[in-house]
From Swiss-Prot:
Taxonomic lineage: Eukaryota, Metazoa, Ecdysozoa, Nematoda, Chromadorea
Gene: fem-1
InterPro entries per UniProt: Ankyrin_rpt (IPR002110), Ankyrin_rpt-contain_sf (IPR036770), TPR-like_helical_dom_sf (IPR011990)
Subunit field text: Component of a complex containing fem-1, fem-2 and fem-3. Interacts with fem-2 (via N-terminus) and fem-3. Component of the CBC(fem-1) E3 ubiquitin-protein ligase complex, at least composed of cul-2, elc-1, tra-1, fem-1, fem-2 and fem-3; mediates the ubiquitination and subsequent proteasomal degradation of tra-1. Interacts with cul-2. Interacts with tra-1. Interacts (via VHL-box motif) with elc-1. Interacts with sel-10. Interacts with ced-4.
Keyword Phosphoprotein: yes
Protein name: Sex-determining protein fem-1
Length: 656
């Protein structure tokens, strides 16, 4: 009996990966005429590991030719690695095109009749793969064979856009010969001109303009001119500025470029030069009137230390030598030009705040991050990833700063965390959850930006709720620490009352069906970016339990809060005691059959925990014993008995 083709899959895959044709022939010589064996070995899925795909990726033309001869399917879609990323759903033709193996590309098309437009999971075609790394010969060949240059990937990004971004001049010119739409937009409103400008490719910019490219705004209101300024490319800016109808556009672009050079390139001298150049741009009467209006109606903000935007050369020169004023000027310019909804505005607010934090100026960090949070919650839908990241950063920074303040024996008063700050951020978390509960627009998280990987894993509402609850609970934990004498809290009434409105959190969690106690007692997996990963203080849990939260509520796995707590690497007897006092059912059983009391016994037997001073016997009830016996010892005798029970008793019985 001939062994199943699956049995040889791994050894043949490995041989194909390194181009060992002789080894492949040894294992296929007796089965090459067995169609089912060939299908099992070469054409059936096994974690995306197809011999033909890996041979095409690695450039082994002789292996590819042999595999095609014996019946390997040229349309299979596997997984290959490019630039340290796994590309999912990759056809052999895409792999060969992206890797630059034209001989294999010709083999697949001419001998195997491969589909020239067969795409990956992200809808990237072989032509786009070839454009990425500039394989001009393959691009020309694919176009000759009917490849469609108009097909975008899943984000609407076309072959012309990727070639423009990657500065592949020859490919850009070749694609333009096909009559491709030079002004086609992605889902986010980007054009090929955006990509060329933002990557500083002057020659490509000129070619696109020559072929009719128009300066259009994306969904954030940024045109290619502003894109060049945000990326720090003065030469591109000068080319594009000539396409604008008025001087005010170039003036603003130079201001924005100066802000980029200061914050991104750390080049204060060049930033000042750009700002001075912006004041020398010739303006028409209408432009001058607009500048005067901006100066007249501009409202300075406290967060920027009431600094006004410079509108003439004298005001710019006042900034010379004052680096703090320059930093605030960059933030003022960026928010005025880009608007409060632009992600760069939020990013640089957080960046500058982090710098102040590192300098020991927590109050400045808080003010800037608070402004960023307010803008994000004003302009974005609930659960926007940037908003959640800002809230997480607040929590982590508060925890680390408080640790430093206490560990350094209160030497640096600027590191002190104020309870009013923590309460504000806690209320911000509650507001984000309340916004989600009241949301009636498009499904949340639909506009989540791609993580940049070919196989993007977007967040879920449940995972984002969990993050927010975690932040809220640990902010309460920070407030508890601030109530200790070691925190040296201020004497003001506001600072003396470090209590959060946990009832507000409970209400919104109930509305969103979030298992608050479960998330509170779940220990997070450590990572390098988190300052605090442990369980909360017992006092925090007591605050929640005082709200009469159900300690026997179950989640989707039928876990009670006690089930979750007992899984923690750190055994916290104070938390276990608090749940027991509130009436945790010791015989509660989850979906996997784990009984709370049995878990405790196992932990004790393995010396993972000591329950000696916890009187577990006091918390064992007759009702629990009976329900456990009915469900475990005599399950067949009591089938369906719960249907005759009152609702509360039925819930109790089914939990055991």
């Amino acid at each position: 009996m001939t062994p199943n083709g699956h049995h040889f899959r791994t050894v043949i895959y490995n041989a194909a990966a390194v181009g060992n044709l002789q080894r492949i022939k040894v294992f296929t010589i007796n089965s090459r005429n067995d169609r089912q064996w060939i299908i099992d070995c070469f054409n059936s899925d096994q974690d995306g590991r197809y011999p033909l795909v890996i041979a095409a990726r690695n450039g082994h033309a002789n292996v590819v030719e042999y595999l095609l001869e014996i019946g390997a399917d040229p349309s299979v879609r596997g997984v290959v690695e490019f630039d340290n990323e796994n590309i999912q759903g990759t056809p052999p033709l895409w792999a060969a095109s992206a890797a630059g193996h034209i001989e294999i590309v010709k083999l697949l098309i001419e001998k195997a009749n491969a589909d020239v437009n067969q795409a990956t999971n992200t809808r990237s075609t072989p032509l786009r793969g070839a454009c990425y790394d500039g394989h001009l010969d393959i691009v020309k060949y694919l176009l000759e064979k009917g490849a469609d240059p108009h097909i975008p990937n899943r984000h609407g990004h076309t072959c012309l856009m990727i070639a423009s971004y990657r500065n592949k001049v020859g490919i850009v010119e070749e694609l333009l010969k096909t009559g491709i739409d030079v002004n086609k937009k992605t889902e986010r409103g980007n054009t090929a001109l955006h990509d060329a400008a933002e990557s500083g490719n002057v020659e490509v910019v000129k070619i696109l303009l020559k072929h009719g490219s128009v300066l259009m705004k994306d969904i954030q209101g940024v045109d290619p001119l502003m894109g060049a300024a945000l990326s720090g490319f003065l030469d591109v800016l000068n080319v594009l500025a000539d396409q604008m109808p008025s001087g005010i556009h170039k003036r603003d672009a130079l201001k924005l470029l100066g802000s980029t050079l200061l914050d991104k390139k750390m080049d204060a001298m060049s930033a000042m030069n750009c700002w001075k150049q912006s004041m020398e741009v010739p303006l028409h009467a209408d432009d001058l009137r607009l500048v005067r209006e901006m100066e007249t109606f501009f409202e300075p903000q406290e967060v920027y230390e009431y600094q006004r935007e410079a509108q003439n050369i004298a005001q710019v020169e006042l900034l010379d030598g004052n680096i703090e004023a320059q930093r605030m000027q960059a933030l003022v310019i960026r928010e005025r030009i880009l608007g409060g909804a632009h992600t760069d505005v939020h990013y640089y607010l957080r960046f500058r705040g982090a710098v102040y934090c590192d300098m020991g100026q927590m109050n400045r960090c808080y003010d800037l991050w608070k402004h960023a949070l307010e803008l994000q919650q004003k302009h974005f839908a609930p659960l926007y990833y940037g908003t959640i990241t800002t809230l997480q950063s607040f929590h982590e920074t508060f925890s680390m700063s408080l640790n430093d303040f206490v560990n350094n024996h209160h030497a640096n008063r600027n590191l002190r965390v104020r309870s009013s700050w923590v309460k504000y951020v806690f209320n911000g978390v509650c507001l984000e959850l309340e916004r989600a509960a009241a949301w009636t627009g498009a499904p949340l998280l639909e506009d989540t930006e791609c993580c940049g990987k070919e196989r993007c894993q977007h967040a879920t509402e449940e995972s984002e709720y969990k993050k927010l609850v975690y932040v809220a609970v640990h902010l309460v934990n920070v407030l508890e620490r601030l109530s200790l004498p070691s925190a040296h809290i201020d004497d003001s009434d506001e600072e003396k009352e470090p209590k959060a409105d946990v009832r507000r959190l409970m209400i919104v969690c109930h509305e969103l069906h979030i298992p608050l106690l479960h998330h509170t007692l779940e220990e997070r997996i450590p990572d390098s970016n988190s300052a605090e990963l442990g369980l909360p203080k017992a006092a925090v849990l007591e605050q929640l339990l005082e709200l009469d939260l159900d300690v026997n509520a179950t989640d989707k796995n039928n876990d009670t809060p006690m089930h979750i707590l007992l899984r923690a690497r750190e055994f916290r007897k104070s938390l276990v005691r608090a749940l027991l006092v509130r009436g945790t059912w010791l015989f509660a059983r989850n979906r996997h059959g784990d009984v709370v009391l049995n878990v405790m016994k196992r932990m004790k037997a393995l010396n993972h925990a000591n329950f000696d001073d916890l009187p577990l016997g006091r918390h064992i009830t007759l009702a629990g014993l009976v329900a456990n016996a009915m469900r475990v010892k005599y399950p067949k005798k009591f089938v369906g008995v719960e249907e005759q029970m009152p609702l509360e008793l039925r819930r109790f019985y089914l939990a055991h």
